[in-house]
């Protein structure tokens, strides 16, 4: 079996491919055992591919856990200049987060046409690809949870209770002003993505990540695809060697 891992800033997702049907799970990077769901499968794993944007210390901790569990080399998959007809716009591809590249690869393999991929995690990334597979560029923005945490920490005197309600009306209390303001900002992002999709003539918008449903609820007209980073890794794994 092949173990695929998407290790983000705060959470990780994993998938076991080659089991007749994929087995999937998730964990928190800071936990002592973020891969506890794999406890019954380690001996069956013969290959490990990882896409990560985690800090070096978090990556090293994960690396040790993987080596202790599976006893096979860990292969790290980073952004590339090109793969399967998809080409990167970055002059220095090592500066692109691996998760963005692998999500784009999954989108490209899925449609082979122009598209946007929106990954709504701790940060929100937006990337555009034309019909020829050329990455046109993208954006990186703070996600809903990151913005909320920032206000709690850096503007502690505001004092507000978190709400998951997605309301963009003007607030009538401090809590409403903050929570509605975050939804209002995100709705503005949604509108900009729609404008860009029209301007670039994109055929599809793919939406993935933990806050995908929230962006969809705020009006983003997109196909929600769970685990696009893992899909991209699985495509790389199917090619054999890196």
Swiss-Prot record:
Keyword Transferase: yes
Lineage: Bacteria, Pseudomonadati, Pseudomonadota, Gammaproteobacteria, Pseudomonadales
Cofactor (UniProt): NH4(+); K(+)
Binding locations of K(+): 119
GO CC, one annotated term: cytoplasm
UniProt organism field: Marinobacter nauticus (strain ATCC 700491 / DSM 11845 / VT8) (Marinobacter aquaeolei)
Subcellular location: Cytoplasm
SUPFAM superfamilies the UniProt entry points to: Actin-like ATPase domain
Name of this protein: Type III pantothenate kinase
Keywords, alphabetical: ATP-binding, Coenzyme A biosynthesis, Cytoplasm, Kinase, Metal-binding, Nucleotide-binding, Potassium, Transferase
Protein's GO biological process: coenzyme A biosynthetic process
Function of the molecule: Catalyzes the phosphorylation of pantothenate (Pan), the first step in CoA biosynthesis.
Class of this enzyme: transferase
Superkingdom per UniProt: Bacteria
Binding site for ATP: 6-13, 122
Residue positions of the active site: 99 (proton acceptor)
Pathway(s) of this molecule: Cofactor biosynthesis; coenzyme A biosynthesis; CoA from (R)-pantothenate: step 1/5
Chief location of this protein within or outside the cell: cytoplasm
Record gene name: coaX
Known partners and oligomeric status: Homodimer.
């Amino acid at each position: 079996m092949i173990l695929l891992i998407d290790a983000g800033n705060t959470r990780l997702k994993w998938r076991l491919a080659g089991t007749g049907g994929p087995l999937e799970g998730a964990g928190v990077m800071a936990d002592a055992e973020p891969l506890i769901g794999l406890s019954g499968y380690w001996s069956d794993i013969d290959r490990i591919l990882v896409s990560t944007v985690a800090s070096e210390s978090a990556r090293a901790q994960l690396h040790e856990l993987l080596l202790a569990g599976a006893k096979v080399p860990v292969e790290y998959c980073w952004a590339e200049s090109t793969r399967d007809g998809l080409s990167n716009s970055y002059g220095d591809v090592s500066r692109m987060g691996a998760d963005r590249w692998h999500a784009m690869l999954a989108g490209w393999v899925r449609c082979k046409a122009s598209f946007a991929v929106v990954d709504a995690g701790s940060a929100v990334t937006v990337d555009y690809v034309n019909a020829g597979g050329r990455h046109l560029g993208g954006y990186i923005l703070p996600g809903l949870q990151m913005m909320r945490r920032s206000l709690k920490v850096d503007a502690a005197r505001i004092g507000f209770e978190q709400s998951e309600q997605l309301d963009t009306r003007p607030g009538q209390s401090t809590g409403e002003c903050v929570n509605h303001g975050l939804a209002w900002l995100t709705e503005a992002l949604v509108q900009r993505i729609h404008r860009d999709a029209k301007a670039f003539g994109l055929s599809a918008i793919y939406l993935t990540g933990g806050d995908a449903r929230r962006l969809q609820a705020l009006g983003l007209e997109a196909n929600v695809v769970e685990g696009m980073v893992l899909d991209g890794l699985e495509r790389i794994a199917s090619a054999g060697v890196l």
